């Protein structure tokens, strides 16, 4: 089985983590550059705790929805709430201790994935 703790660290205007197979890391890097982002560095590293959250500031909600569908995930978590991939509707919520504001909800530019969901499933399927 592939290592579920493999994650991608992205440095840029803001930093983020996403758990992903190497092929997705390359795809993400290309897409970020196409969107005009200029990450200083993208490196693979290991993050140990399975309950960690991975923050991907670069993804718009529409991109997060597309990604979740690509990996057959029923829903995904964003700063705005939990989005159902079948309907595209988001139930808004504020996770305990998670900071967010109206500007984040308006821009829909901050996707958050808990470990063990969409991308980790892809890693399991690659094994």
Model-assigned labels for residue ranges:
Residues 36-71:
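Short, intrinsically disordered low-complexity segments
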Residues 71-79:
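Short arginine-rich
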Residues 15-16, 53, 74-75:
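Hydrophobic beta-strand segments of well-ordered beta-sheets in folded domains
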Residues 45-50, 79-95:
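Short proline/glycine- and acidic-rich turn/helix-capping motifs at secondary-structure junctions
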Residues 62, 83, 124-125:
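Intrinsic-disorder/low-complexity regions
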Residues 19-24, 58-60, 78-82:
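Short, flexible beta-strand-to-coil junctions
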Residues 1-38, 103-127:
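N-terminal, charge-rich interaction modules
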């Amino acid at each position: 089985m592939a290592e579920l703790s493999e994650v991608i660290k992205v440095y840029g205007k803001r930093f983020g983590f996403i758990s992903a197979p190497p092929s997705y890391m390359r795809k993400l890097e290309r897409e970020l550059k196409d969107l005009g982002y200029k990450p200083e560095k993208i490196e693979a590293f290991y993050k140990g705790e399975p309950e960690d959250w991975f923050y991907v500031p670069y993804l718009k909600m529409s991109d997060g929805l597309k990604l979740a569908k690509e990996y057959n995930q029923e829903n995904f978590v964003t700063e705005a709430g939990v989005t159902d991939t079948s309907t595209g509707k988001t139930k808004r919520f504020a996770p305990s201790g998670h900071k967010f504001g109206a500007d984040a909800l308006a821009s829909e530019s901050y996707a958050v994935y808990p470990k063990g969901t969409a991308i980790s499933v892809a890693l399991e399927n690659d094994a």
